[in-house]
Amino acid sequence: MSSDLPNTIVNRTTVTSPDRGEEIPMDVLAAAQPAKLYILIGTNALVQPGNDDSFLAYYAKMLDDLRMTLPNTVFYVQSVLPATQAEIADSLPGLAPDRLAVINAAIQQLCTERGCCYLDLNAEFADDAGCLQSEFAQPDGVHLTVSGYSKWVSYLCTHVPYDKDNPYQAGSTYYLSDDMKNLLSDIP
C-alpha cells in the first residue's frame, strides 16, 4: 500500500496495491488493528512549495482518524526526511531545510498533543545545512541507499520506548549491539 499524502487517508481514497488490488488504507489498518504503527508520510506532498497549513490540517486529521480507528495502537510518527542539497536546488524546492524544519516542528507538536511518539530522523540523516547526507542518498537525492536503510532500521530499533515484545530493540536478549555486529561481520 502506497500513500504519501495525509489526505489520501483522511478522504478514504482508494489506492492500488500490486498484491491485493484496490483498497482503502484506513480499512486495511482497521482490519489489522496493529499493536504499533510507524508513520512516515509527506515527502511527495511537499516536493513543491504549497499550502503548509492545509498539509498540516490533513496530517492532524489523519492522526485523529487513526487514533479513533486504532485506539490500542502505539503510533511512531517519523519526521519528513530532507533531500540532498543538489536536488533541492535543481528540482525539489519544497524540501528546503528551513521549510521542513517548520513542518517537522509542527508534526512533532501534533504528536505531543495526540500522544504519539515522534521520531526525528533528521537528527541522523541531515548534514549541518539540514540536507540529506549524500552518502545515504540515491542519485535522485530523495530515496535512501542500502546503507541509508540500514541506518534507518538501526535508528528505529534504538529510538523507540523499550518493549519486551520487540526482540530487535536494545535491551532485548536478541538485539545485537554494534560491537556484536562488528564481531560477526569479521567472521568469514
Question: Residue locations for each model-derived region?
Answer:
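Conserved SGNH/GDSL esterase-like catalytic core that processes O-acyl groups on lipids
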Residues: 1-60
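Low-complexity, flexible helical/coil segments
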Residues: 4-6, 71-77, 112, 152-159
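Short, flexible active-site loop motifs that bind/organize anionic cofactors or intermediates
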Residues: 27, 65, 139
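N-terminal cationic-hydrophobic initiation segments that often serve targeting/anchoring roles
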Residues: 29, 66-68, 108-111
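Loop/turn elements at helix/coil->beta-strand transitions in domains of secreted/extracellular proteins
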Residues: 32-37, 70-75, 113-117
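Active-site segments of SGNH/GDSL-like serine hydrolases
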Residues: 38-46, 64-101, 123
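Generic structural signal for well-ordered alpha-helices
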Residues: 59-64, 104
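Catalytic His-Asp segment of secreted/periplasmic serine-dependent ester chemistry enzymes
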Residues: 82-188
